UniProtKB/Swiss-Prot annotation:
Keyword NAD: no
Protein name in the entry: Glycogen synthase
Record gene name: glgA
Domain of life: Bacteria
Function: Synthesizes alpha-1,4-glucan chains using ADP-glucose.
Length: 480
């Protein structure tokens, strides 16, 4: 089976979040199930800089007003189609924002161009290759199925994956003529959304199947609390809604071979984590004692619950714990966490920014990772924690609920517990979870059991890829 995947970011070429990890890992995992994937992504400077010997496969003299070309290249096991459109993508800043952190004002056109190019490839314009199915990711690629509905490929099945419904791609109605869609596409069964143009909404209305990145999140987005205004649209397609948990690349994330980890280890050699623990203490200038090290590796935002972490940091220290934080985000939260580190030298360490190697070392050396998200479609850091024996302490929401088994009495007795869940996501709820963790940590035999059970969890892409392959086959066989 041939699949065209369309994504605005793909690891290891360009990454701002978990979307890139999925777009980069899923195609490789699908190979075991007979799925050949070509992934279309924009030709950002970071992408163009690393690709080697690309071949021009398709040219667009006028792609929504600008020239563009599709380049094909192999990169680290991925078969990539790069949309080389300098007018859209060759600019400073990130994939979506300028160097000052502001959204590019023409994002509507930049990602409509990506979707239009994808629909043309779906129609067979790429010489010698036409997909059996198109799989799009988030709002940046969601217009693909809209273009497919109104142009030559309405019969080709499409899947849309929602990685985070909070990001919907809504724009004013004045941009509609620039999309070059027929006038009747500006309708409630397509991209019209309360008088605006809704990219994600249009994708939801036109895709043949919708997936989210965990079963719990699939249920949550049907509610007003989590649906972000689109719960009614999603409910109208509930028969085509599927929750499939993400996996991680267990070759990259492997404590037995990870080149960043100072001392390698596995479930039977957990004592080797001590050297990594000392490295963490040194990096964050912590006291070298046996107190548990709790870590946070996250965007520092309200959605991620970082205000709660900042508010209880003093109490974590008062309970006898240590805290290290790696991340960046809202200035007020960065400041609050840095202030807590100043108040508690040797007990709290904060590093503002993102450091991929350090994120690996923190998973390998810290005792527990705190993930207090108010909503979390899937989450990856808890999967890394399970893999590395860094016990996850998570909010009971979304994919966190689906991937971490709470250490309640029954789960502990059955020796299946892998972490600690808490609800509600409040200061009180999180402090109760920290107290439970401190209690378990004091019983080293019990703590080691939690670590080992987590490390036995199957966090690979194999099961998830099998489910995606089955969904693809079902849609293709139905002739959607």
């Amino acid at each position: 089976m041939k699949v065209l995947s369309v994504s605005s970011e793909v690891f290891p070429l360009i990454k701002t979040g978990g979307l890139a990890d999925v777009s980069g890992a899923l195609p490789i995992a699908l190979k075991a199930f007979g799925v050949e994937t070509k992934t279309l992504l924009p030709g950002y400077p970071a992408v163009m800089k690393v690709i080697r010997d690309p071949v021009v496969r398709l040219e667009f003299p006028d792609l929504l007003g600008e020239p563009a070309a599709v380049l094909e290249v192999q990169h680290e096991g991925l078969d990539l189609l790069i949309l080389d459109a300098p007018a859209y993508y060759d600019r400073p800043g990130g994939p979506y924002v300028d160097p000052l952190g502001k959204d590019y004002p023409d994002n509507w056109r930049r990602f409509a161009a990506l979707s239009l190019a994808a629909s043309e490839i779906a129609a067979g314009l790429l010489p010698g290759w036409r997909p059996d199915l198109v799989h799009t990711h988030d709002w940046q690629a969601a217009l693909t199925s809209v273009y497919m509905r109104y142009y030559p490929t309405p019969e080709l099945p499409s899947v849309l994956t929602i990685h985070n419904i909070a990001f919907q791609g809504q724009f004013g109605p004045e941009i509609f003529p620039g999309l070059r869609l027929p006038a009747h596409a500006f309708a409630t069964d397509s991209i019209e959304y309360y008088g605006t143009v809704g990219y994600l909404k249009g994708g939801l209305q036109t895709a043949h199947a919708i997936t989210t990145v965990s079963p719990t999140y699939a249920d949550e987005i049907l509610t007003p609390e989590f649906g972000m205004g689109l719960e009614g649209v999603i409910a109208s397609h509930i028969d085509n809604l599927h929750g499939i948990v993400n996996g991680i690349d267990t070759d990259i994330w492997n404590p037995a071979t990870d080149p960043v980890v100072h001392t390698h280890y596995g479930p039977t050699t957990l004592k080797n984590r001590e050297e990594n623990r000392r490295s963490i203490a040194e990096f964050f200038h912590l006291d070298n004692d046996d107190a548990p090290i709790f870590c946070v590796i996250s965007r520092l935002t309200w959605q991620k619950g970082m205000d709660i972490v900042a508010n209880i940091a003093d109490e974590i220290v008062a309970m006898g714990g240590k805290l290290v934080v790696l991340g960046s985000g809202e200035a007020a939260l960065e400041g609050a966490l840095l202030a807590s580190a100043s108040r508690h030298p040797g007990r709290i360490g904060v590093s503002i920014g993102y450091n991929e190697p350090m994120s690996h070392l923190m998973q390998a050396g810290c005792d527990a990772i705190i993930i207090p998200s108010r909503f979390e479609p899937c989450g990856l850091t808890q999967l890394y924690g399970l893999r590395y024996g860094c016990v996850p302490i998570v909010a009971r929401t979304g994919g966190l609920n689906d991937t971490v088994i709470d250490a309640n009495h029954a789960a502990l007795a059955a020796k299946v517990a892998t972490g600690i869940q808490f609800s509600p996501v409040t200061e009180t709820g999180m402090l109760q979870a920290i107290r439970r963790a401190m209690h378990f940590y004091a019983d080293r035999k019990l703590w080691t059991q939690l670590q080992k059970q987590g490390m036995k969890s199957d966090v690979s892409w194999e099961k998830s890829a099998e489910r995606y392959a089955a969904l693809y086959s079902s849609l293709v066989s139905k002739g959607m």
